[in-house]
């Protein structure tokens, strides 16, 4: 992810968060069942919605790794106990939507946003409801992004939202080439507004005060940013993305200055522009009337020609998540980077991402420099010739799309840049940094769940694609002292914040593409010094339908960390109750009900879980029949699609309401590229895939249908999706493996191979449809003994589809192609296995990449 979202940014770029360890590559994600809002056809409200369920987590070792070999060892853990549990406050798309951002209120309730414009509020016990909804423009990554709580909320009840108002923007994609008049209809804004949150937890839409509009080039991807935070002085900080398309720059910097090109392909107009608010972190002081003042000490003083005084820091690509340390004023920023698989002296460095530590206003380099001030090359997209490398100490913006200063402030190096396994404590996989909060221990706070004193002053970093949270300790000048694991169980970290109780609140995106799913969640990680609560798990065999609706409920999966026997009670939301573990209940009247399971241990501790039931309207069933899940394709293909939809209340389906979107998948995030309406048709994919050809890219087709409601109940949406696999891919982008390692090879495409191969080692990829594949050609090298490469389906010992002999090529950097003819492939979706055979005790051979030939 990168995601702008972590669905969306690209390097590791997300919404999802762009769309990001070693066995979590995006293309190997199981599609699973269809779902409401994004996965294979699950009926309406997918999965159990846990509320107040807790999970005991192992304590990480104190002072684990040292990032700086010369740094002092980490201090020993303080006396405070470390025994964490993870409490599930909300789970599943109905309770999270497409999770984007969170903010914790003084009473421990949590506001969290969904990109479709919905704002939800979840109380400390895990009860979730809709607080309000904004109308939003939602092409590509746009929609509702960040939420922030005014420092004076207890008195004024002000909250802040960053969103894309609909305006009169045309539907569909903006043109990539044309004239200014062609591009102008897609000029829009992303808006920072202040609202009042009513005492009952509902949003007062009429109270909106428009604070700040940030320009936006609509109809074409990517990078919105949109995080909100405050410093101790009450100044508001807002992060903004570069609003630039990375897909036609070969994975390097997008600085296309051609006159007929949509300006979205030139990040010099935004991140490198001192007179533009994009690609920045902005700092303002919001006044009571909704106007704002400029605090002293921003990057450019008010009145400075060709500058915007709101800019605190510039030169960011997509600073999707950041936080302000309230005690020091230091900003910790996760900034996404581009995707080049290897450095090119004619273009610039390989893709990398970074955590930035912003101690004062400055320029952080993009689009001229990245990482540890690694400079890009001034490339002419018209002539395809390279000039000189940019000067990071004195960058100049000479783009015709620049409206600001030519001479820019010097670029600041990243605090922690990383790519691949360059920071051992970060592991491997895609790169998608999420800037989290800094913890400050309060000895006077009477809270049994607050984090230990040993964590005081530590920065909590998230990684969307690698699925971890790390605690980073540093000294006063930022030198990293240690990097420690934070125990949590979840999928893709979207946002984090410490609450007034000293517990860590985490928003989990889930694993779908641009939509919530059954894994999307809101968690509270507590230091469980007073003992552990039960984990309640509620489930239902159906979650929508006509009255009378008979539902079988289940408490299966409910547990207690201490092994105690649990008792159960159910409240079905319509006045009915039960003390059975797995009751059956019939809903007789139309309505939307919340059925809540409470599990209690002998000490009286409880955990709750809930599931929503809609009576009166049945969720539509959506089946994406074409393309098949795992179907082979090549970027540039026109891919046919076919969708089948049924809905009891709608009856005859209006195919104009069926929407099919092509998403460019990269690692574990994606970017919506284009869409079409209809039950059948064809979508033209981009010729280059939009990334470096050596990147881990693939396609995702998403089909959705929203019904017309029924029985007085809300309309329901169901999605189904298929992954389509490129015929050519790098071997190192495997999903799972046995025995092998990823090896750096200068002559390899993308700079890496699958190496250290011994007899019976293997790598796997999923999903794949291989029924029309006739050959697999692999690029290999060997200074070992060579051997045989087998192509199998289903398992390492599954059906043998073909094999190729791998000769000794004369060196690990001497590559040649070998080809296996394929036959007898199973029909439908399977898992592809490359199994390695050979004699001897040393490494046999390396595999660089492979390409399928199809009928």
Language model regions located:
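Conserved blade-ending motifs and adjacent loop-strand segments that build the rim/top face
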Residues: 480-500
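Extracytoplasmic
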Residues: 544-551, 582-586, 594-598, 603-605, ...
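Residue-level detector of Asp-centered blade-edge/turn motifs that repeat once per structural unit
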Residues: 104-107, 151-155, 230-233, 326-328, ...
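Beta-propeller domain segments
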Residues: 97, 116, 142-144, 166-167, ...
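Secretory targeting and sorting signals
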Residues: 2-5, 31-67
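Asp-box/WD-like beta-propeller blade repeats and closely related beta-sheet repeat scaffolds
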Residues: 174-200, 204-229
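A short helix->beta-strand "capping" segment at the edge of beta-propeller domains
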Residues: 75-94, 205-208
């Amino acid at each position: 992810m990168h995601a702008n979202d972590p669905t969306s940014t690209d390097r590791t770029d997300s919404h999802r968060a762009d769309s990001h360890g070693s066995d979590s590559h995006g293309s190997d994600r199981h599609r699973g069942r269809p779902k409401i809002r994004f996965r294979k056809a699950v009926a309406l409200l997918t999965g159990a919605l846990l509320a107040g369920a807790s999970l005991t987590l192992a304590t990480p070792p104190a002072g684990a790794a040292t990032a700086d070999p010369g740094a002092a060892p980490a201090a020993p853990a303080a006396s405070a106990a470390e025994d964490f549990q993870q409490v599930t406050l909300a789970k599943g798309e109905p309770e999270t939507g497409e999770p984007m951002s969170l903010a914790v209120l003084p009473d421990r309730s949590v506001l969290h946003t969904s990109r479709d414009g919905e704002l939800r509020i979840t109380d400390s016990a895990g009860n979730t409801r809709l607080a309000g909804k904004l109308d939003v423009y939602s092409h590509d990554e746009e929609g509702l992004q960040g939420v922030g709580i005014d420092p004076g909320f207890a008195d004024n009840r002000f909250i802040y939202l960053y969103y894309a108002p609909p305006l009169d923007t045309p539907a569909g994609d903006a043109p990539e080439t044309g004239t200014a008049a062609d591009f102008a209809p897609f000029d829009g804004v992303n808006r920072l507004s202040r609202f009042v949150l009513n005492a009952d937890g509902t949003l007062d839409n009429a109270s909106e005060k428009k604070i700040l509009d940030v320009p936006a080039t609509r109809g074409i991807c990517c990078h919105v940013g949109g995080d909100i935070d405050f410093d101790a002085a009450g100044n508001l900080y807002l992060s903004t993305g570069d609003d630039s398309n990375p897909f036609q720059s070969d994975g390097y910097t997008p600085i296309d200055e051609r006159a007929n090109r949509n300006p979205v392909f030139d990040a010099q107009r935004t991140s490198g522009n001192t007179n533009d608010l994009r690609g920045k972190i902005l700092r303002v002081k919001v006044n009571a009337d909704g106007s704002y003042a400029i605090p002293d000490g921003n990057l450019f003083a008010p009145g400075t020609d060709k500058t915007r005084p709101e800019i605190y820091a510039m030169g960011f690509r997509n600073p999707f998540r950041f936080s302000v340390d309230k005690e020091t004023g230091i900003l910790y920023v996760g900034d996404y980077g581009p995707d080049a698989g290897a450095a090119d002296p004619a273009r610039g460095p390989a893709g990398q991402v970074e955590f930035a530590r912003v101690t004062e206003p400055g320029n952080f380099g993009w689009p001229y420099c990245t990482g540890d001030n690694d400079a890009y090359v001034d490339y002419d997209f018209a002539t395809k010739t390279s000039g000189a490398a940019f000067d990071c100490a004195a960058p100049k913006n000479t783009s015709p799309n620049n409206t600001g200063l030519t001479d820019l402030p010097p670029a600041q190096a990243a605090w922690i840049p990383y790519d691949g396994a360059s920071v051992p404590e970060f592991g491997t996989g895609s790169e998608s940094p999420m800037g989290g909060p800094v913890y400050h221990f309060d000895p006077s706070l009477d809270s049994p769940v607050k984090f230990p004193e040993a964590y005081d002053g530590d920065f909590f970093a998230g990684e969307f694609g690698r699925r971890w949270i790390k605690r980073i300790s540093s000294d006063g000048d930022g030198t990293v002292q240690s990097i420690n694991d934070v125990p949590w169980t979840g999928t893709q970290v979207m946002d984090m914040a410490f609450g007034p109780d000293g517990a860590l609140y985490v928003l989990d995106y889930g694993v779908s593409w641009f939509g919530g799913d059954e894994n999307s969640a809101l968690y509270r990680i507590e230091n469980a010094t007073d003992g552990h609560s039960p984990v309640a798990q509620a489930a239902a065999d159906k979650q929508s339908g006509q009255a009378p609706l008979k539902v079988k409920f289940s408490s299966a999966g409910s547990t207690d960390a201490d092994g105690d026997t649990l008792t159960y009670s159910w409240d079905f939301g319509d006045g009915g109750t039960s003390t059975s573990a797995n009751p059956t209940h019939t809903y007789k009247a139309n309505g939307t009900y919340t059925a809540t399971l409470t599990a209690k241990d002998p000490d009286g501790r409880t955990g709750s879980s809930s599931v929503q039931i809609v009576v009166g309207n049945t969720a539509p069933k959506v089946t994406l029949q074409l393309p098949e899940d795992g179907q082979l394709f090549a970027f540039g293909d026109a891919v046919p699609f076919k969708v089948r939809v049924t809905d009891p209340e709608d009856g005859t389906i209006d195919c104009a309401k069926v929407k099919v979107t092509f998403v460019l998948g990269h690692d574990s995030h994606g970017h919506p590229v284009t869409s079409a309406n209809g039950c059948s048709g064809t979508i033209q994919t981009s010729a280059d895939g939009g990334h470096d050809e050596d990147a881990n890219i693939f396609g995702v087709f998403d089909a959705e249908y929203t019904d017309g409601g029924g029985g007085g109940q809300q309309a329901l949406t169901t999605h189904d999706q298929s992954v389509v696999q490129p015929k050519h891919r790098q071997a190192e982008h495997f999903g799972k493996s046995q025995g092998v390692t990823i090896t750096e090879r200068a002559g390899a495409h993308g700079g890496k191979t699958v190496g250290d191969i011994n007899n019976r080692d293997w790598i796997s990829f999923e999903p794949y449809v291989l029924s029309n594949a006739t050959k697999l050609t692999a690029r290999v090298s060997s200074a070992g003994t060579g051997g045989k490469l087998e192509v199998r389906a289903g398992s390492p010992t599954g059906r043998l589809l073909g094999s190729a002999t791998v000769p000794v090529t004369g060196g690990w950097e001497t590559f040649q192609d070998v080809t296996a003819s394929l036959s007898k492939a199973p029909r439908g979706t399977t898992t592809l296995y490359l199994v390695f055979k050979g004699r001897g005790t040393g490494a046999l051979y390396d595999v660089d990449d492979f390409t399928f030939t199809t009928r």
